[in-house]
């Protein structure tokens, strides 16, 4: 089958991109290929469901720009489509004095990014927002909320198809042949021809990109599993909304935090441990070929050397419920190991370059017949409509 545009990947970014293209130009023939039998199965459907504000990201970066624009677009979309969401606000809490300068830097960054109402709060105010939370300093970020991103992605898919887009489920991409003005995409259920391939394959985005070019790719996806605990129901009162620690500025993860969920309940987590399989949601899941690729990547070896202490701490928390609880106790001293019930896990696709740099920003590249979204971790779900709009602009310039 022939299409002017084919999107690979039925996560929230791929679906948002397809929707944006069909909204901008309904006459373009667009298809989306997804290897699973449903959309939003992986990163989109296995995250903490937070609507991010843009607090953490370097001013002028793609993350800052797209998160702030995406936040407003997402809220409007949810309102228009009657998707349940709540703007709960959150607190970011320094639990030690040495974290206060980092907290102040976060506040300054948020203000530079245009956040409204974000401010330092007193410890009395902290007790008002989160009565059981402890710390030496805190900021309050009202532009933060919660939503079920799987519902959002499914609505993107519905509207994309109403506008004439086609979604092909169960179509795993096996091979891409590049010709002068077209690409032939071979899948597990047949072949497709397209003028423009848009790669939104998430955990396999580097693999798809490599299929589409002869040169060796200079980045590789490293899968990090994030594990969650649920707070047992009778102890959910310990958390009113969202409580975050001050993140390690050298590590691209936000640290274990507390999140009230849209479906009900409270989750604690995630940690960040190397997954031994790209879609390895359990400790026992191993793909030896994928693991060997990760371990042999020069960039990962440098990351492991640089962050080995942090990595060992995360691994210890993965296997020790007590250690996980101890990390949570820094924010809520009353939390007990017995309050935690093992929850689910997600796997984050984190791009790593050859020099050992964990890419801190979104990474979108284009070549002759393709656009590749190579790094779209958090806050990509919040930013999805904005990222989709950016990719849409790049795509429509070709027609």
Swiss-Prot record:
Top EC group: oxidoreductase
E.C. no: 1.1.99.2
UniProt cross-references to Pfam families, sorted A to Z: DAO
InterPro entries hit by this protein: FAD-dep_OxRdtase, FAD/NAD-bd_sf
Keywords, ordered alphabetically: FAD, Flavoprotein, Oxidoreductase
UniProt KW Lyase keyword: no
Keyword Ribonucleoprotein: no
Catalytic activity of the protein: (S)-2-hydroxyglutarate + A = 2-oxoglutarate + AH2
Gene3D superfamilies listed in its UniProt record: D-Amino Acid Oxidase, subunit A, domain 2 (3.30.9.10), FAD/NAD(P)-binding domain (3.50.50.60)
PANTHER family listed in its UniProt record: L-2-HYDROXYGLUTARATE DEHYDROGENASE, MITOCHONDRIAL
Family the entry assigns: Belongs to the L2HGDH family.
Role description: Catalyzes the dehydrogenation of L-2-hydroxyglutarate (L2HG or(S)-2-hydroxyglutarate) to 2-oxoglutarate (alpha-ketoglutarate). Active in vitro with the artificial electron acceptor 2,6-dichlorophenolindophenol (DCPIP). Also displays a very low oxidase activity in vitro on L-2-hydroxyglutarate with O2 as the electron acceptor, but this activity is most likely not physiological.
The protein's name in its UniProt record: L-2-hydroxyglutarate dehydrogenase
